């Protein structure tokens, strides 16, 4: 992580582009029995968990001005894992987990 920015691992889960703090990533591996699928193991910064995705797109550094918190009203409507913020860049929008 550089000063004033967050380095994110960007993945495509088939529905959205998701970003995970690179410091939290333990390992990325191909999912067994899932051609073209990947399993991202997280847990360096919190509780261990696994995230399945279709593809790993790489990493991106977002500055503080490119990150916006997700309003609580919207977070309540989202089922499953809830993003804490949205990253907005010239390349696209990322849900941050």
Which stretches of residues belong to each language-model region?
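An acidic, low-aromatic, low-complexity terminal/linker signal
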Residues: 1-97
């Amino acid at each position: 992580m550089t000063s004033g920015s967050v380095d994110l691992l960007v993945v495509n889960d088939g529905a959205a582009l998701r970003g995970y703090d690179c410091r939290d990533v333990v390992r990325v591996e191909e999912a067994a029995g899932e051609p073209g699928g990947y399993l991202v193991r997280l847990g360096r910064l919190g509780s261990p968990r696994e995230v399945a995705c279709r593809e790993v797109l790489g990493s991106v550094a977002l500055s503080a001005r490119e990150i916006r918190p997700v309003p609580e009203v919207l977070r309540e409507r989202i089922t499953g894992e809830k993003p804490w913020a949205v990253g907005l860049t010239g390349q696209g929008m990322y849900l941050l987990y």
